Curated annotation (Swiss-Prot):
NCBIfam families: metK. InterPro entries: ADOMET_SYNTHASE_CS, S-AdoMet_synt_C, S-AdoMet_synt_central, S-AdoMet_synt_N, S-AdoMet_synthetase, S-AdoMet_synthetase_sfam. Binds 2 divalent ions per subunit. One of its GO terms (biological process) is one-carbon metabolic process. It comes from the Bacteria. It is an enzyme of class 2 (transferase). L-methionine binds at E56, Q100, D257, K288. This is S-adenosylmethionine synthase. Homotetramer; dimer of dimers. One of its GO terms (molecular function) is ATP binding. Catalyzes the formation of S-adenosylmethionine (AdoMet) from methionine and ATP. The overall synthetic reaction is composed of two sequential steps, AdoMet formation and the subsequent tripolyphosphate hydrolysis which occurs prior to release of AdoMet from the enzyme. It is found in: Cytoplasm.
Length: 413
């Protein structure tokens, strides 16, 4: 393996695209909490003073969409003097939702490979390809660049919410570049944080002085706490640390950029370290394999790495609309596997049920929003859907399945 630098980014919950993801998933949570059979494809658009809900929803649930949208925007932090042209109390909220197409509904409700097995009776909600990935670079079996980028973004939001740095505003981005030697991460090359802030900080109005103060504050209150338990830590001498490289970041959020659901799919997954099938997650109910099958693919890949059958594993699944069973399953271990990829593929087929209804049942995806107090999917809409130690995600719990793979693989070793 060659030496290289790999870079991944994350964004905070106040980023315009992430506002949209959270609103779409808050709608999904609310609908599933009241009607677990809801069919949801909810898209959100935000701009200065405007939030638009659109898409297709079929549900028995009755929902005050406008009230819910304002609640999410307020909780993110867009309210009052720091709203910046996008106040939760005064922004316009437009709702333009249709029902799910009966042609799609028919294929999902009654798969073409239907039989007495109930899990065969639910077809995939669309065609498509999904990837799952895991590697042994971090305890959560995620690539280090995206893992660290999320840590920084989470800590950045935390010090804002807790008013440790009360000049911070909701919009922000992080980016991390990691040095690899022979394919193994060895040091943090660069950390970049762009964070929205007030025009004046502690009486300081000079642009360069403000930037320098933010840089010093972020190193102490964001970078060091976010990395204190890592084996690979940033160094004042060796790690390049960039903050707001344009000089200032006062105008942000939807006032600075329009936002749209599903535009941060690489942030949501593996930071570009693994392939992506192109389908977004947020606002989609579990019958949409863009979401549920991507979770299942991660579950498979993580189980393989946890079982130490490979140091890296990437799993591709493909589906046809209205068909229950995957069209194809592919596994790649990049030369790190201890058994052949053909044998690994057979292990997957024999130990994982990857039909949509089986995935939904395995992870209890329809019922989790209600069980979690009305909020489950929204929590995944910021800071990644995978490797989340702060959330109890069923596709991340692989102890039992990895042990099963260890036993099943013994005859192949």
């Amino acid at each position: 393996m060659s030496d290289f630098i790999f870079t991944s980014e994350s964004v905070t919950e106040g980023h315009p695209d992430k506002i949209c993801d959270q609103i779409s998933d808050a709608v999904l949570d609310a609908l599933l909490s009241e009607d677990p059979e809801s069919r949801v494809a909810c898209e959100t658009v935000v701009n200065t003073g405007l939030c638009l809900l659109t898409g297709e929803i079929t549900s028995r649930a009755k929902l005050d969409y406008i009230k819910l949208v304002r609640k999410v925007i307020k909780e993110i932090g867009y309210e009052g003097s720091k709203a910046g042209g996008f106040d939760s109390n005064s922004c316009a909220v437009l709702v333009a939702l249709d029902e799910q197409s009966p042609d799609i509904s028919q294929g999902v409700n009654e798969a073409d490979d239907i039989n007495e097995d109930l899990e065969n009776n639910t077809g995939a909600g669309d065609q498509g390809i999904m990837f799952g990935y895991a590697c042994d670079e971090t305890p959560e079996l995620m690539p280090l660049p995206i893992s660290l980028a999320h840590r920084l973004a989470i800590q950045l939001a935390k010090v804002r919410h807790e008013k440790v740095l009360d000049y911070l505003l909701p919009d922000g981005k992080t980016q991390v570049s990691i040095d690899y030697k022979k394919g193994v991460p060895v040091s943090i090359n660069t950390i970049l944080i762009s964070t929205q802030h007030t025009a004046e900080i502690d009486g300081i109005t000079n642009e360069e002085e403000i930037r320098q103060k933010i840089k010093e504050d972020l190193w102490i209150n964001v970078v060091l706490p976010a990395t204190e338990d890592l084996e690979i830590k940033p160094s004042n001498q060796k790690t390049r640390f960039l903050v707001n490289p344009t000089g200032k970041f006062v105008v942000g959020g939807p006032q600075g950029d329009a936002g749209l659901t599903g535009r941060k799919i690489i942030v949501d997954t593996y930071g570009g370290y693994a392939r992506h099938g192109g389908g977004a997650f947020s606002g989609k109910d579990p019958t949409k394999v863009d979401r549920s099958a991507a979770y299942a693919a991660r579950y498979v890949a993580k189980s393989i790495v946890k079982a130490k059958l490979a140091k890296k594993a990437e799993v591709q699944l493909s589906y046809a609309i209205g068909v229950a069973k995957p069209i194809s399953i592919l596994v790649e271990t990049f030369g790190t596997g201890i058994i052949s990829q053909d044998n690994l593929k057979e292990l997957i087929k024999n130990n994982f049920d990857l039909r949509p209804a089986a995935i939904i049942k395995e992870f209890d995806l329809r019922n989790l929003p209600k069980k979690m107090g009305g909020e489950f999917f929204r929590k995944t809409a910021s800071y990644g859907h995978f490797g989340r130690n702060d959330l109890n995600l069923p596709w991340e719990r692989v102890e039992e399945k990895s042990a099963q793979l260890v036993e099943a693989s013994k005859i192949l070793l």
